[in-house]
């Protein structure tokens, strides 16, 4: 099974507001950068989209070390999701889980691989996390007010 390192980040200008996500995938010496964004979103949704998009980009099952600066993503997929599923996608106080469709997509993407999640401190000089942050900002740029969007 191939081993891939993935570094993800999300960004939002306003919360909610325009946002972007970025990911760096590394397999040996080969690297791939991904980014995207939305006009109206939240930082948590962008953090989730970064992880989902990166895992979905892998063409075959891989052993993955996924690095995120989002405790929300790390704790959600490794701790909270089990209770949410058991409770019919409701929180412990019976409210609908925010971003449930993204959590479900992340779980589906994760289940195709052997994923180990790692939390890294954001904006602390971690080179790959800084690159993922730059990509997230690049993904957000077309959606900021006054910017033209080209396709």
From Swiss-Prot:
**Organism of this sequence:** Rhizobium etli (strain ATCC 51251 / DSM 11541 / JCM 21823 / NBRC 15573 / CFN 42)
Residues forming the RNase H type-1 domain are 1-141
Record field: catalytic activity: Endonucleolytic cleavage to 5'-phosphomonoester
Q: Return the protein name.
A: Ribonuclease H
Query: What protein family is recorded?
Result: Belongs to the RNase H family.
InterPro entries according to UniProt: RNase_H, RNaseH-like_sf, RNaseH_domain, RNaseH_sf, RNaseHI
Q: How does it assemble?
A: Monomer.
Q: Which cellular component appears as one GO term in the record? A: cytoplasm
- Binding note for cofactor: Binds 1 Mg(2+) ion per subunit. May bind a second metal ion at a regulatory site, or after substrate binding.
């Amino acid at each position: 099974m191939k081993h891939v390192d993935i570094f993800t980040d999300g960004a939002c200008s306003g919360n909610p507001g325009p946002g972007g996500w970025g990911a760096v995938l590394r397999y040996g010496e080969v690297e791939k950068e991904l980014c995207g964004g939305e006009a109206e979103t939240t930082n948590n949704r962008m953090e989730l989209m970064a992880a989902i998009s990166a895992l979905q980009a892998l063409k075959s099952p891989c052993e993955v070390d996924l690095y995120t600066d989002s405790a929300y993503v790390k704790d959600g997929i490794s701790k909270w999701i089990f209770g949410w599923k058991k409770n019919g996608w409701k929180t412990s106080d019976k409210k609908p889980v925010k971003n449930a469709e993204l959590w479900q997509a992340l779980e589906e993407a994760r289940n195709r691989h052997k994923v180990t999640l790692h939390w890294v401190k954001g904006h602390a000089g971690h080179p790959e996390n800084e690159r993922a942050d730059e990509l997230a900002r690049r993904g957000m740029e077309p959606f900021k007010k006054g910017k033209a969007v080209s396709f």
